Amino acid sequence: MPAAISRNWPAPAKLNLFLHINGRRADGYHELQTLFQFIDCCDMLDFKVTETPELILHSNMSGVVADSDNLILRAAKSLQQTTGFNGGAEIWLDKRLPMGGGLGGGSSDAATTLVALNKLWHTQLSTEELAKIGLKLGADIPVFIHGFAAFAEGVGERLQAVNPSEPWYLVIAPDAHVSTADVFQDPLLPRDTPKLAIDTLMSQPWANDCQKLVVSKYPQVAKALGWLLEYAPSRMTGTGACVFGEFTQQQQALAALAKLPSEMQGFVAQGMNLSPLITRLSHP
């Protein structure tokens, strides 16, 4: 009897509510202090366990194999190799999040793959063990596996659960692809923000150390951020290109969205301190 398809596994987007760069390590990675929060806008994945070890991915992206697709298959393969599981999976990705942009969609897809297949394959790895696999694939993946809003240090892997407010956001996705590698290699990127205690960071105005550099190089990001600042406190997430404005009420965010210039793409979402992936994990 063929296995049933396990449906509707969410892979939520994240925002970096602040992002500080504290230095550069000998291995080239950067020391960071950042605050991750999820938003209720997600890619969705379905999974079917197979008896043979093949990993097959289907996507709604018109046959385009994107980085997130590759990361999904790499995550599944890593779980197979770590656990010795000799079956496989067929995976369907419904891609709804903007590609790249600093929302973490590819990392989130990989995290959901690890969490879902660990359950469906009955491989019984702990959250920490899954996070170790995820960290080898991408620095942002552990926060999606743990599934709670978090203050992160190191390269982003040392996580401390936090409970910031859950406002409404208007997220704008400029028509620009910002290379994370290029941003972190740029000599003009500030790398000397002092490390601060979490209590201090949570109570002071929030900023993104990558924003000034990206805005100077990408006029589309500068234009989107400039427009958004007319309506709400706003900044960039990750290394961009997405920017977000913060609103206390949904109606305020929707009212601003209604005025969005036609050449810009945006959406309204609410902050979430608990990932919908964790909620889904408790269901069959």
From Swiss-Prot:
Instruction: Indicate yes or no for the key word Kinase.
Output: yes
| Positions of transmembrane segments | none
Gene Ontology annotations of biological process type: isopentenyl diphosphate biosynthetic process, methylerythritol 4-phosphate pathway; terpenoid biosynthetic process
Q: Where does ATP bind?
A: P98, M99, G100, G101, G102, L103, G104, G105, G106, S107, S108
The protein's name is: 4-diphosphocytidyl-2-C-methyl-D-erythritol kinase
Q: Which InterPro entries match?
A: GHMP_kinase_C_dom, GHMP_kinase_C_sf, GHMP_kinase_N_dom, IspE, Ribosomal_Su5_D2-typ_SF, Ribsml_uS5_D2-typ_fold_subgr
Tell me the classification of the organism that encodes this protein: Bacteria, Pseudomonadati, Pseudomonadota, Gammaproteobacteria, Alteromonadales
Which family does the record claim for this protein? Belongs to the GHMP kinase family. IspE subfamily.
General function of this protein: Catalyzes the phosphorylation of the position 2 hydroxy group of 4-diphosphocytidyl-2C-methyl-D-erythritol.
Q: Which UniProt keywords apply?
A: ATP-binding, Isoprene biosynthesis, Kinase, Nucleotide-binding, Transferase
Active-site residues from the entry: K14, D140
Q: Which reaction does it catalyse?
A: 4-CDP-2-C-methyl-D-erythritol + ATP = 4-CDP-2-C-methyl-D-erythritol 2-phosphate + ADP + H(+)
- What are the EC numbers? 2.7.1.148
One example GO MF annotation: ATP binding
Pfam families associated with the record:
GHMP_kinases_C, GHMP_kinases_N
- Enzyme kind, highest EC tier: transferase
Q: In which pathway does it act?
A: Isoprenoid biosynthesis; isopentenyl diphosphate biosynthesis via DXP pathway; isopentenyl diphosphate from 1-deoxy-D-xylulose 5-phosphate: step 3/6
